[in-house]
Amino acid sequence: MNTQQLAKLRSIVPEMHRVRHIHFVGIGGAGMGGIAEVLANEGYEISGSDLAPNAVTQQLTKLGAQIYFHHRAENVLNASVVVVSSAITADNPEIVAAHDARIPVIRRAEMLAELMRFRHGIAIAGTHGKTTTTAMVTSIYAEAGLDPTFVNGGLVKAAGTHARLGSSRYLIAEADESDASFLHLQPMVAIVTNIEADHMDTYQGDFENLKQTFINFLHNLPFYGQAVMCIDDAVIRELLPRVGRHITTYGFSDDADVRVAGYRQTGAQGHFTLERKDKTLLNVTLNAPGRHNALNAAAAVAVATDEGIDDEAILRALERFQGTSRRFDFLGEYPLELVNGQSGTAMLVDDYGHHPTEVDATIKAARAGWPDKRLVMIFQPHRYTRTRDLYDDFAHVLSQVDVLLMLDVYSAGESPIPGADSRSLCRTIRGRGKIDPILVTDMDTLPELLSQALRGEDLILVQGAGNIGKLARKLADSRLQPQISE
């Protein structure tokens, strides 16, 4: 952003009084790093700490941020404010030092709310689909020439980053319900994609508490704001009478204000018609597979239509949509040397989905787009508590693939729970009689086990939210070699 653009932005968005140096504890996370990137581009001095470098910290370093790969008290002593990730505990030495020095310590969402305070905020919430929907809204606004600021939980491929500072009044952001911190946000427009029982430790195991929290989030909208909600979701349909704001619904349902009709899929593209409240139609080609992505697009179109964005810009953005990292992320089609000496090709897809509903949507999208391919899934369960709470759903959904290789549970800091481990889950799936899952307890054995499982012309789904994304890249870079045409 040049000096003239920054000056224009300053006329829209005032500086935070007395704040010059902002320190982030846990800066390597996508959400934290995205906010840090926007603030760095606004001219604030940025520092932060994390345990190891990654793409997020590398990008921030290029922008002039000081990154420490350790947690020490001295890291925060010159900061005006400390922003803390929800993964950081209160006994972290930087948090303790900040409190001792009377430096304000705030959560990530509080800083996001501050960015949103003087902007036209569009917040995307829901159990599933937040990241992709945020990217779709961003893509449409960018295509329309509105140059929005955005902060997303996943890398927006078209932009090559999780976040970017725009020159307009629009801020598009993913809103995180996992720790209820989205209640800090006060947007003008809020999308809710769906509501399911997840992160229930935050809500004391009470689903009614979770539902009421979403209603409270929507009531942060001004009375002239807009709630955009998926009416296909049974919980959202139940909650509609309790939402005291203007509502636009979307979905496949006949009574949706923005209705998806005639969906079909060819490869990675979805084709469908959107029927809007004013009876106008949009014939959409969406460069993202699956009925769930058609719903995400309908939400984005509802917001864009309300803003008055031209239909042609909407259609161009959706047809050119490049997606986000680790959301049905096509890593290439590669030749394979199989153990029987034959050759073949495998399509490699990396996907972040780690809840049964998300995994089911990925499987359905793969089946619809590539009906002749076998589905070979490498799955890493995420958290023992989620595996325990959704055990039967996982067993059902994972039984739908043709071959399943299951890694050990990615604990995310949790202690093991008896009966909520990968071995138990494999045993239960095997007992259903559809497939015989392969338990992978040693990652070094995975390439050989995968070679034995593949027949050629397969579709490999690398699925999960832990460190399995690194495995997908490793497979793409080493085990599977790109075909070289002569």
Curated annotation (Swiss-Prot):
Q: By its UniProt entry, which SUPFAM superfamilies does this protein fall under? A: MurCD N-terminal domain, MurD-like peptide ligases, catalytic domain, MurD-like peptide ligases, peptide-binding domain
Give the main EC class: ligase
Q: Does Transcription show up as a keyword for this record? A: no
Enzyme Commission number, as recorded:
6.3.2.8
Q: What job does this protein perform? A: Cell wall formation.
Q: Which family does it belong to?
A: Belongs to the MurCDEF family.
Provide the protein name.
UDP-N-acetylmuramate--L-alanine ligase
| Organism field | Pectobacterium atrosepticum (strain SCRI 1043 / ATCC BAA-672) (Erwinia carotovora subsp. atroseptica)
Q: What is the lineage of its organism?
A: Bacteria, Pseudomonadati, Pseudomonadota, Gammaproteobacteria, Enterobacterales
